[in-house]
Amino acid sequence: MSLKINVRESGNVVILDLIGRITIGEEAASLRDTIKEHLDSGQKNILLNLAEVSYIDSTGLGQFVGSFATVTSRGGQLKLLNLQKKLQELMQITKLITVFETYTNETAAVRSFAGAATAG
């Protein structure tokens, strides 16, 4: 199963609903390209909804880190929503859980961007 990306907006936050697998090849490239398109159009607050991600490999994790660095360097924020149990464990093992803000509630995640915007 390839990666499908549904794009929604909530206020000034772009929510990317990811469905499928994030692996080496087209899937990781598609995620990178989608994030870059939104950054290029001035949308800097990005929330990745991972509720329906069935599998992620090391390339997928690397894509998260690369995207985080790109978004941050352009004055934005990238946050994660609805990590599945296996991904949550993987993020803890790799210590990436300390890099990303993660949420289980979409409303709280979207509101967290508003707090950051007023602080900057």
Where would I find each of the regions flagged by the language model?
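STAS-typified acidic loop motif
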Residues: 5-33
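Exposed loop/turn and edge beta-strand positions of beta-sandwich/beta-sheet ligand-binding modules
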Residues: 1, 12, 77
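Amphipathic alpha-helical interaction surfaces in cytosolic regulatory modules
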Residues: 22-100
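Short acidic-hydrophobic, aromatic-tinged amphipathic segments that line or gate anion-handling sites
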Residues: 101-105
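Acidic phosphotransfer microenvironment of two-component signaling modules
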Residues: 85, 107-108
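Non-catalytic signal-transmission and effector/linker regions of two-component phosphorelay proteins
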Residues: 1-9, 114-120
